[in-house]
Structure formats: C-alpha cells, structure tokens
Amino acid sequence: KPHWVLHPATDAERTVAACMDVPAIRELFMPAETAIVMKEQRIEAIDGNVWISGVIDRLVIDGNSACIVDFKTDHADTAEQLRERHEAQLQAYARIVSKITRIPCDRIRLMIISTHLKTVIQV
C-alpha cells in the first residue's frame, strides 16, 4: 500500500485510506505503468453554452482511453442516489476531457467513489 494509506496525514487521506480495503476502490489506484495519472486536476471550460469550473479528483489516461474518478462524501442511502445526483457533472467533465485529449467520450469511464458507502459507482 502507498505510504499515505499506511500513515494518512490529513482528513482526506484518512477518509480515502479507510476505503482502500475495498478491492474495487483499491483497483482504481493501481493503473497500468503506461498510464498518466493526474490528481486534483482543475478544469475551466465552456461546455455547449455553459461555463464549467471544477476539479477532477483523479484522471487516468492510458492510450486512447481514460477514467475520471470523483470522490463523494455525500451521505446518500444508495449508490443510485449518488449516480443521479452527480451524473451530469461527470458527463460534463468527460466532454471536456474528450475535447482536450481527443479521446472519444465512449472511451472515458466515469467512476464515483462514495466514501460514505465505501463503494465504486460507475456512471
């Protein structure tokens, strides 16, 4: 495990470290050696006629595919509630990443890690 998981220094690191025992979550932190991993990637762009300003928590680009991972601390009862609540945001991020990288949207996976439910939710 990474050093920060074994010895978390911040509240955010403690929250994520507590989720790392879940295999599906841990897998998202083990990209291929060829992958480019960006953390807390700030984006500002116009999507259609809407200004989008946000931070992609984790963006993994590997060849002609990508994965956007967004951590959510919402206290939702179900994964479906979180998916519905955040789907539009992640889809907007995917469109922006697609424009920047030229990776088609259908090759960009959208994942939510719920720190409350300790699960991965595919959007």
Language-model features, listed with the residues they occupy:
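A non-catalytic, helix-rich entry segment at domain boundaries
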Residues: 1-46, 119
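Mg2+/Mn2+-dependent nuclease catalytic core
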Residues: 49-123
